[in-house]
Amino acid sequence: MATVSRKKKKVKVTPEGAVHIKASFNNIMVTITDVQGNTVSWSSAGKNGFKGSKKNTPYASQVTSEAAAKEAFDLGMRHVHVFIKGPGAGRDAAIRALQGAGLEVRTIKDITPLPHNGCRPPKRRRV
């Protein structure tokens, strides 16, 4: 069976965009989109070589957001609005890394979903 090579879709990048940071207890994912929501660049802790419990550290979060921000900066993005979701460890480190990579952070919004007493949580760990 012959392999089919697919051409990567070129995204026209505007100087304004959005950064979506999902910081869970196990991993961190950073996606940078344009104003319409089309993905410009993305990165995760696993993509940057972190394994296991090291994925949920502030340093992994810093490296992850620097990698995504550098790619978006090279494509022409300069100003971003940040949306953070989740309770992970490296939320603040991710924002500082975005600013360090040259992106100007205009707004920061926490969009972590909070239940109005929805599902019963899992039982407490006894170690």
Swiss-Prot record:
GO terms for molecular function: rRNA binding; structural constituent of ribosome. Keywords: Ribonucleoprotein, Ribosomal protein, RNA-binding, rRNA-binding. SUPFAM superfamilies: Translational machinery components (SSF53137). InterPro entries: Ribosomal_uS11, Ribosomal_uS11_bac-type, Ribosomal_uS11_CS, Ribosomal_uS11_sf. GO terms for cellular component: ribonucleoprotein complex; ribosome. One of its GO terms (biological process) is translation. Disulfide bonds: none annotated. Located on the platform of the 30S subunit, it bridges several disparate RNA helices of the 16S rRNA. Forms part of the Shine-Dalgarno cleft in the 70S ribosome. HAMAP family: Ribosomal_uS11. Belongs to the universal ribosomal protein uS11 family. Part of the 30S ribosomal subunit. Interacts with proteins S7 and S18. Binds to IF-3. This is Small ribosomal subunit protein uS11. It comes from Chlorobium chlorochromatii (strain CaD3). The lineage of its organism: Bacteria, Pseudomonadati, Chlorobiota, Chlorobiia, Chlorobiales.
